């Protein structure tokens, strides 16, 4: 089963299954000298962690264990391996789906490709979103490296079901949405999202949503024409996330409804710099970053595992039957999906920053360490749960 690695210079390989002993990631290409603590990784994982209100009831501690590539609190330049144990597994809840593939899931395609006898049906196996733990763990290191360029990345849930945010939002509000149980950047929006999630839970159903990720202060010129354009790599990164159905940046699909005179980014002079007046392009033109904030969105479909009865096939008889999925599932996978989308954007940006020479590939100097630590501590402490806007 190839296809488990992502990135060029900053390269990750994830491993593990939903109900296996552990999941994890190997990170290649991290320069030596970067200060890394277990707490740095735990901070990012905490916003993806299950077992909280409005998400799956599976209670995983998600405590990372760094087993290689770090010595005396600093990276050595060798591959970094991070393990996260699966501690709250109830495989008996999945016995029915062994013979009844779930609608909307990868069950049947996996069976057809790899064979029924080779398919790990427990919790979705390798196709489970549990795999994304490794991506989020790696993003802590990516985000810390990006402190060198003072590049910050944050995401929020722009829409859930039919409720959508259609008013301006600041980067600080987006950053503080980490502490919202439904990743809302406004208090009024949080209440509406919570009502929808409660409704879906009662009905045994689910909702989809749209995650929006902002890259603040990205370096200019990230991206490599022609097939490694920044937008292309961002699209691949986000579309690789389980349940993601679509990707757009800047104006996105709305640009198709506009005239060129409306959609074009006018170039203006601000001080001694050339800037774009509206940033309609979402910080990317010609596949290269412009220096404006990068704005991307990805659409998550509703969680496929629902209690409502649906048609499927009983593989023992070959006949149609029904299935009601019993287990611990997110009523809206987009809520925790924001953290994963944020992580994937971080991995793309740090990889291209290294390729463009903005971040060293061999060793971090002592002066650079001071800059990284100062900015990272600011990132950790900047927002508090009470700062989610009204």
UniProtKB/Swiss-Prot annotation:
**HAMAP family with a match to the protein in the record:** Chorismate_synth
Q: Know the name of this protein?
A: Chorismate synthase
Name the cofactor(s). Answer: FMNH2
Task: Kindly tell me the pathway this chain contributes to.
Answer: Metabolic intermediate biosynthesis; chorismate biosynthesis; chorismate from D-erythrose 4-phosphate and phosphoenolpyruvate: step 7/7
Residue intervals passing through the bilayer: none
Q: Which InterPro entries match?
A: Chorismate_synth, Chorismate_synth_AroC_sf, Chorismate_synthase_CS
Any single GO molecular-function term of the entry would be: FMN binding
Q: Which UniProt keywords apply?
A: Amino-acid biosynthesis, Aromatic amino acid biosynthesis, FAD, Flavoprotein, FMN, Lyase, NADP
Binding locations of FMN: 126-128, 286, 301-305, 328
Catalysed transformations (reactions): 5-O-(1-carboxyvinyl)-3-phosphoshikimate = chorismate + phosphate
Q: How is the cofactor bound?
A: Reduced FMN (FMNH(2)).
Q: Name one GO cellular component term.
A: cytosol
This entry's Enzyme Commission designation comes to 4.2.3.5
Q: Which GO terms describe its biological process?
A: amino acid biosynthetic process; aromatic amino acid family biosynthetic process; chorismate biosynthetic process
């Amino acid at each position: 089963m190839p296809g488990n690695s992502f990135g060029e210079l900053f390269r990750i390989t994830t491993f593990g299954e939903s109900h296996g002993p552990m999941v994890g990631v190997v990170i290649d290409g991290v320069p030596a000298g970067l200060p890394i603590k277990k707490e740095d990784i735990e901070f990012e994982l905490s916003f993806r962690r299950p077992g909280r209100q409005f998400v799956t009831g599976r209670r995983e501690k998600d405590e990372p264990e760094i087993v290689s590539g770090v010595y005396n609190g600093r990276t050595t330049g060798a591959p970094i391996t991070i393990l996260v144990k699966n501690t709250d597994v109830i495989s008996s809840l999945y016995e029915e789906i062994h013979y009844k593939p779930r609608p909307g899931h990868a069950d049947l395609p996996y069976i057809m490709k790899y064979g029924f006898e080779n398919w790990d049906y427990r919790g979705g196996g390798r196709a489970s979103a549990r795999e994304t733990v490794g991506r989020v763990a790696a993003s802590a290191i990516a985000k810390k490296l990006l402190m060198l360029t003072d590049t910050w990345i944050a995401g929020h849930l722009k829409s859930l079901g039919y409720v959508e945010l259609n008013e301006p939002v600041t980067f600080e509000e987006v950053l503080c949405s980490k502490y919202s149980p439904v990743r809302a950047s406004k208090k009024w929006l949080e209440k509406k999202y919570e009502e929808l999630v409660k409704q879906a839970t009662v009905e045994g159903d689910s909702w989809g949503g749209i995650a929006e990720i902002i890259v603040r202060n990205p370096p200019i010129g990230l991206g490599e024409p022609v097939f490694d354009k920044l937008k292309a790599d961002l699209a691949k990164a986000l579309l690789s996330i389980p349940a993601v159905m679509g990707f757009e940046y800047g104006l996105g699909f709305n640009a198709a409804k506009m005239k060129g005179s409306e959609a074009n980014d006018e170039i203006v002079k601000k001080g001694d710099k050339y800037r774009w007046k509206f940033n309609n392009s979402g910080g990317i033109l010609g596949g290269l970053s412009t220096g404006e904030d990068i704005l991307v969105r990805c659409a998550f479909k509703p969680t496929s595992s629902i209690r409502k009865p649906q048609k499927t096939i009983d593989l023992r008889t070959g006949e149609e039957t029904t299935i009601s999925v019993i287990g611990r599932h997110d009523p809206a996978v987009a809520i925790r999906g924001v953290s994963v989308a944020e992580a994937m954007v971080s991995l793309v940006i740090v990889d291209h920053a290294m390729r463009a020479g903005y971040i060293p590939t061999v060793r971090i100097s002592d002066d650079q360490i001071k800059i990284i630590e100062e900015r990272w501590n600011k990132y950790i402490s900047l927002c508090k749960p009470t700062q989610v806007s009204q």
